[in-house]
Regions:
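Acidic/glycine-enriched connector segments
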Residues: 1-142
Length: 143
């Protein structure tokens, strides 16, 4: 999980009740929503020692806009753009894996069904589509 407020939080709480060892949080920065990190495996992208050449970063077929944001993450890590990009890098690590984090084999999303595949969720769905990783939104799993 990316540890987002709302659906991610409720999903994490539910899984923690039945199998806390199955929860893995990949964070855009170490103290992201610190309260929800208790009792589960967490890894921030800062701790992963990623580089622009890391497979989780370079193998994504990104648009020019996304690619520029990701480049800024490595070139100017304190910039506002880099902070925004840290969420995209986190999403790429969740999909592609890195180090101890295995790549995903499937994904469940809570998406805005009136405007699907937008924002960070849409970005991650696009990565899944590119890699032919099956995924479902609440239109499927919520029935």
């Amino acid at each position: 999980s990316g540890n987002a407020d709302g659906a991610d939080q409720y999903f994490i709480e539910g899984v923690k009740e039945v199998a806390p060892d199955r929860v893995q949080l990949v964070l855009p920065f170490k103290n992201h929503r610190k309260k929800t990190q208790v009792g589960v495996y967490t890894q921030s992208i800062e701790q992963l020692q990623l580089s622009a050449e890391s497979p989780a970063v370079y193998q994504a077929n990104l648009s020019a806009n996304y690619r520029r944001l990701i480049d800024l993450y490595f070139e100017q890590p304190q910039s506002k753009a880099a902070i925004k990009a840290s969420y995209l890098v986190r999403d790429m690590v969740m999909v592609f894996g890195h180090g101890d984090l295995a790549p995903i084999s499937a994904a469940y999303f809570y998406d805005d069904l009136t405007q699907t595949c937008q924002g960070g969720t849409g970005f991650t769905m696009q990565l899944c589509t590119e890699l032919k990783i099956p995924f479902w939104n609440q239109g499927v799993w919520g029935k």
